[in-house]
Amino acid sequence: MLDIKWIRENPEALDAALAKRGAEPLAQNLVALDEKRRSAVQKAQDLLSRRNLASKEIGAALSQKNGELAEKLKVEVAELKAMLPAVEEEDRQLTAELNDALSRIPNIPFDDVPVGKDEHDNVVTRTVGEKPRWNHTPKEHFEIGEALGYMDFERAAKLSGSRFTVLTGPLARLERALGQFMIDLHTREHGYTEVSSPLMVRAEALFGTGNLPKFEEDLFKTTDGRYLIPTAEVTLTNLVREEILDQEKLPLRFTALTPSFRSEAGSAGRDTRGMLRQHQFWKCELVSITDAESAVAEHERMTACAEDVLKRLGLHFRTMTLCTGDMGFGSRKTYDLEVWLPGQNAFREISSCSVCGDFQARRMNARYRGKDDKSNRFVHTLNGSGTAVGRCLIAVLENYLNEDGSVTIPDVLLPYMGGLTKIERAA
């Protein structure tokens, strides 16, 4: 959430930033609403001040045996007391209206973020590795998985409907191996602390990360009002909600390997076959909590940690800097990692790493105490996928496919595969 004080002082900057994101100007309406709210606050404060002063004057009048004045003052105090509830209610309503409006405004992009409309305007930052060179024809992951006999969409649909998958045997083990490899890498070598956290959260947690109120249609909601997490970013980031941290203890780096749940409400007709876009999928999430000065460097570090997963798997990928029109709601700058999928003859997103500034921290009231002046400031938050397990499975299947239809296990996963070096067709 943006600071209304900053908006009051920089209305043109807000509208310019919104224009970069393809959004309409909002500063004038926000400033006008804030003026009404501040006026209501001042009115309530004036009434309280006058009531308190009149109450003291009653005592003075009585001590001077001026009963007539005391009675007049008592009448005034009663009138002021009667007026206060309406003024305070106006203040509450205007504050709620302003906060709701602020909660729906996206974050301000950094100056170095490329301006653009959509994914076609994203910029290639770097490319790692090369496309595999084969004599055989590439295949899509669902063709490979079904031919092996370990990937079943028909049974998944019978169980749960569309956008679900059943994996069995060595493919189920490969999925588990990928997740275990990622969490081991990030905790043992990248300095992240593993967290096991709930898969259901309250609305307040989703508000904190910016998923609510704007993106409720993307979420699964339980009958008791809780939500299934769309990503472990929600739980990991909210670990510091309503806390004041010591600057000396920053950065905090958290990671979790969890299922994620998404309704894919805006994805009708997209990636309907296979595992690319599922309602339920495993993901290894990375979250960093930093001070303001360290956030940009931490963003580069986090992205490098996610890239390391793909490098060790021997996968060809590129890192994209997202343009203003393609960035997430809470992001100030985002790198997407796109892995090469031979079966699609295309790069597809496998990780997204974002720096959010104090945007989420304001929503969570998460702060740190400065080590020099001891003043309290909002933390800066970052999040990234390290990486999406299902999409990594897809990439391994398509990039390690052999001519006979078998799939070679990448070397880095061999310790997790119980002696299996290749996945072959089920007998």
From Swiss-Prot:
GO biological process, one term: selenocysteine biosynthetic process
Broadest EC class assigned to this enzyme: ligase
Residues binding ATP: 262-264, 349-352
Disulfide bonding pattern of the chain: none
EC numbers for this chain: 6.1.1.11
Reaction equations catalysed: tRNA(Ser) + L-serine + ATP = L-seryl-tRNA(Ser) + AMP + diphosphate + H(+); tRNA(Sec) + L-serine + ATP = L-seryl-tRNA(Sec) + AMP + diphosphate + H(+)
Binding-site positions, L-serine: 231-233, 285, 385
Source organism, top-level taxon: Bacteria
One Pfam assignment: tRNA-synt_2b
InterPro entries found in the cross-reference section: aa-tRNA-synt_IIb (IPR002314), aa-tRNA-synth_II (IPR006195), aa-tRNA-synth_II/BPL/LPL (IPR045864), Ser-tRNA-ligase_type_1 (IPR002317), Ser-tRNA-synth_1_N (IPR015866), SerRS_1_N_sf (IPR042103), SerRS_core (IPR033729), tRNA-bd_arm (IPR010978)
Record GO terms (molecular function): ATP binding; serine-tRNA ligase activity
Keywords: Aminoacyl-tRNA synthetase, ATP-binding, Cytoplasm, Ligase, Nucleotide-binding, Protein biosynthesis
Annotated Gene Ontology cellular component terms: cytoplasm
Subunit text: Homodimer. The tRNA molecule binds across the dimer.
Domain commentary: Consists of two distinct domains, a catalytic core and a N-terminal extension that is involved in tRNA binding.
Family: Belongs to the class-II aminoacyl-tRNA synthetase family. Type-1 seryl-tRNA synthetase subfamily.
Protein name: Serine--tRNA ligase
Species the sequence originates in: Rhizobium leguminosarum bv. trifolii (strain WSM2304)
Taxonomic path: Bacteria, Pseudomonadati, Pseudomonadota, Alphaproteobacteria, Hyphomicrobiales
Gene name in the database record: serS
